[in-house]
Design a protein with these regions (language model features):
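Acidic/histidine-rich, surface-exposed loop or edge segments in extracytoplasmic proteins
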Residues: 28-34, 53-55, 93-98, 117-121, ...
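Soluble non-cytosolic domains of exported or imported proteins
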Residues: 39-46, 63-68, 86-90, 103-110, ...
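Catalytic cores and adjacent binding grooves of peptidoglycan-active enzymes
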Residues: 159-160, 187, 228, 233-235, ...
């Protein structure tokens, strides 16, 4: 009986080992190919443009999904027997994704390098040559994602890399980081949301009304964030209204009712937010009744002192 017990224990251990051998841990079970369409911008669009070139459909690599890129997407979808709607969803990404490894070169490698730089600050030369530095960066990302660090960029690595959130860049001087709820490292969002906000902030900076304070967005891999009922899926970002003295990054916080509230400048800010993400702004919560009447913002409780942008 004792011997039978030892045999059963050994069998259970071997079964667990065999089952685990082919199933690497999945750190991001929510990982999925992003839905990318007209008006989107950012590092995912850059990768898309490189991958189109890898399939013989070169377009200008500008990080914006405009008419030229959309036309190339439609042509690619038609050639692959996919729904030719110009929307890059899971089936189109899956068909575009090219497995690359050390020794390969070309636009698909450039797509990998650009994504690693944008989402993991890899510091790679986006030269299209899959050398040792790129291989090490790929392995580091794979370890980070829990998908098996073999250095080969296959379907699972593409999906996790394209899904992974991006940190807002505060180094340009057009924005300043704020953490009103004490959430450290909470300025991550989808690549599209980040790029669209950065473009809006850059355009707004040209008005001379000072940099844009950015409150919480989300954590690197999403999930619950203290002080927020949303901000879990990388599509929600808080920014602060503009002051008449343009000191919104250094002076005290205001509401739309404060004497130092600059309605005209805040209106312009919302207009830039919408203009830089055509068709991709779900809503902007902010309780200024004038901006609400103009169709620029939507009323919601506790949104007197910040604008809550929800991208789609």
């Amino acid at each position: 009986m004792r011997q039978l017990g030892r045999v059963l224990t050994l069998f259970a251990a071997l079964t667990a080992l065999l089952l685990g051998a082919g199933l690497p841990a999945q750190a991001f079970p929510q990982a999925a190919f992003p839905l990318t369409s007209d008006g989107n911008r950012g590092s995912d669009v850059v990768a898309l443009q490189h991958l189109l070139a890898a399939h013989g459909r070169p377009v200008t690599v500008d990080g914006v999904l405009g008419s030229g890129t959309r036309g190339a997407v439609v042509a690619f979808q038609q050639a692959k027997g996919l729904t030719a709607d110009g929307i890059v969803g899971p089936a189109t990404w899956d068909a575009l994704a090219v497995t690359v490894r050390q020794g390969d070169s070309g636009p698909a490698v450039r797509a990998v390098q650009s994504l690693l730089n944008a989402k993991r600050s890899a510091g790679l030369a986006a030269d299209g040559a899959f050398g040792s530095a790129t291989q090490e960066a790929v392995r580091a990302f794979q370890s980070h994602a829990g998908i098996g660090a073999d250095g080969v960029v296959g379907p699972a690595t593409w999906k996790n890399l394209l899904w992974h959130y991006e940190n807002i860049d505060f180094g340009t001087g057009t924005m300043c980081a704020q953490s009103p709820d004490g959430n450290a490292h909470a300025h991550w969002a989808t690549a599209g949301a980040v790029a669209q906000l950065e473009a809006a902030a850059a355009a707004f900076a040209g008005t001379g009304n000072g940099p844009l304070p950015v409150g919480d967005a989300g954590f690197e891999h999403g999930g619950d964030i203290p002080g927020h009922a949303s901000h879990e899926t990388g599509l929600d970002i808080d920014v602060w209204p503009v002051r008449t003295d343009s000191a919104q990054c250094t002076a005290g916080r205001i509401t739309w009712q404060s004497p130092t509230y600059d309605r005209a400048a805040t209106r312009r800010l919302v207009q830039e937010i919408r203009a830089k993400a055509p068709g991709h702004v779900e809503l902007v919560y902010f309780n200024d009744p004038q901006l609400i009447s103009e169709g620029l913002t939507t009323s919601y409780p506790n949104h007197d002192n910040h604008l809550h942008i929800r991208y789609r």
